[in-house]
């Protein structure tokens, strides 16, 4: 919460928008490239809890496109209800149990090595951020009366919390789901569990 070393005491939320950065992945795909968009520095990307891709306008449903055309560019009027949703979510977030946090910490811990093996390592800062994001998304789902459980919230936070997106990396859902399933299998296992010992071994020769 600092800019050039100056503390911003009233800062609560921060976000930014950027065009998709040029990368080898984007150049290989048949997609429009933004020549002036540069990948974010890893340290800067790590300071954003979520790196979310906005769909192309053509990918929206007909109804959503109509809504954008009808209301796009207008200043929102009246109470959108967002403040109330945030307050309710913050209340539910505080109620996150120690057992839930224990599960979340174990889950994030089990992501570290598979992500490194996949070439997408995360820092300690990102790991802590994922822990907070999972709890926040879980509370948000409860506020919105959605069907997603804690495991589903974990995948959403994991999928949209990888900082490499800000460097132009393209992720395949199948690979992310495979890593997610590996982490789920390892959560709660005793330290001497064969599965946990295999997954926790960084040396490929010893793992065999």
Description of each model-found segment:
Residues 33, 38, 42-45, 51, ...:
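A broadly tuned preference for mixed-charge, low-complexity surface segments
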Residues 45, 66, 70, 83-94, ...:
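Generic detector of well-ordered alpha-helical segments enriched in charged/polar residues
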Residues 139-208:
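C-terminal engagement/docking regions of AAA+ P-loop ATPases
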Residues 21, 48, 52-56, 72-76, ...:
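Conserved NTP-handling cores and scaffolds of large molecular machines
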Residues 23-39, 84, 104-108, 141-151, ...:
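Short, Lys/Arg-enriched charge-dense amphipathic segments
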Residues 72-149:
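Conserved AAA+ ATPase small/helical "lid" subdomain
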């Amino acid at each position: 919460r600092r800019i050039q070393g100056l503390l911003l005491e009233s800062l609560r939320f921060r976000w930014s928008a950027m065009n998709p950065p040029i990368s080898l992945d984007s150049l290989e795909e048949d997609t429009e490239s933004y020549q002036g968009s540069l990948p974010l520095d890893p340290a800067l990307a790590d300071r954003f809890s979520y790196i979310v891709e906005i769909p192309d306008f053509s990918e929206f449903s007909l109804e959503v496109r109509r809504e954008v055309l009808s209301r796009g560019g207008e200043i929102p009027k009246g109470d959108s209800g967002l403040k109330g949703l945030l307050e309710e979510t913050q209340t539910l977030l505080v109620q996150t149990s120690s057992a839930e946090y224990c599960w979340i910490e174990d889950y994030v811990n089990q992501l570290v090595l598979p992500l490194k093996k996949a070439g997408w390592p995360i820092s300690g800062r990102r790991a802590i951020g994922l822990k907070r994001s999972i709890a926040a998304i879980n509370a948000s789902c409860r506020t919105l009366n959605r069907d997603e459980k804690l495991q589903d919230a974990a995948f959403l936070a994991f999928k949209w919390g990888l900082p490499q997106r800000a460097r132009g990396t393209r992720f395949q859902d199948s690979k992310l789901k495979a890593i997610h399933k590996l982490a789920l299998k390892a959560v709660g296992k005793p330290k001497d569990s064969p599965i946990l010992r295999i997954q926790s071994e960084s040396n490929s020769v010893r793992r065999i």
